[in-house]
Every structure is written in C-alpha cells, then in structure tokens.
C-alpha cells in the first residue's frame, strides 16, 4: 500500500517539475508544423467517437 502511494507521489512530482516539457516549443525548422502538433492530442478522441458513430450505423448489434 505504501509503495503505491509513493509511486503516485513520484509520478506527480515528476509531472509538476517537467511541465515545461509538455509546453515546449518546436525548433524553428519545424515551426510550420505547429498547427498539426496542436491537433495531434485530439486525434484519439476522434477514433473513440468514430466507434459510437459506427455502432449507431449498424444499430448497436
């Protein structure tokens, strides 16, 4: 039980201290890809929604 809490604490601390990693900027050579990189985290949600649309199309068999 204690190991679980310490693991959660380590994960939270590393997330807080590395937040600059998540909000970093692309190098100038790749600046034109900024719009694509901004959309990329949302792409898995599209697949999740597609599953519901697909099931609705086949009447939730």
UniProtKB/Swiss-Prot annotation:
GO BP, sorted A to Z: photosynthesis
Family: Belongs to the PsbK family.
Protein name: Photosystem II reaction center protein K
Subunit structure: PSII is composed of 1 copy each of membrane proteins PsbA, PsbB, PsbC, PsbD, PsbE, PsbF, PsbH, PsbI, PsbJ, PsbK, PsbL, PsbM, PsbT, PsbX, PsbY, PsbZ, Psb30/Ycf12, at least 3 peripheral proteins of the oxygen-evolving complex and a large number of cofactors. It forms dimeric complexes.
Job of this protein: One of the components of the core complex of photosystem II (PSII). PSII is a light-driven water:plastoquinone oxidoreductase that uses light energy to abstract electrons from H(2)O, generating O(2) and a proton gradient subsequently used for ATP formation. It consists of a core antenna complex that captures photons, and an electron transfer chain that converts photonic excitation into a charge separation.
Keywords, ordered alphabetically: Chloroplast, Membrane, Photosynthesis, Photosystem II, Plastid, Reaction center, Thylakoid, Transmembrane, Transmembrane helix
Signal peptide location: none
InterPro entries, A to Z: PSII_PsbK, PSII_PsbK_sf
Annotated HAMAP family: PSII_PsbK
Membrane topology: Single-pass membrane protein
Compartments in which it is found: Plastid, Chloroplast thylakoid membrane
NCBIfam families xref list: PRK02553.1
Propeptide stretches in the record: 1-24
A single Gene Ontology CC term: chloroplast thylakoid membrane
Membrane-crossing residue ranges in chain numbering: 36-56
């Amino acid at each position: 039980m204690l190991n679980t809490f310490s693991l959660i604490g380590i994960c939270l601390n590393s997330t807080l201290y590395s937040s600059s990693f998540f909000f970093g900027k692309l190098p100038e050579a790749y600046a034109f890809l900024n719009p694509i990189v901004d959309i990329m985290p949302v792409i898995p949600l599209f697949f999740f929604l597609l599953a519901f649309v697909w099931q609705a199309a086949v009447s939730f068999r």
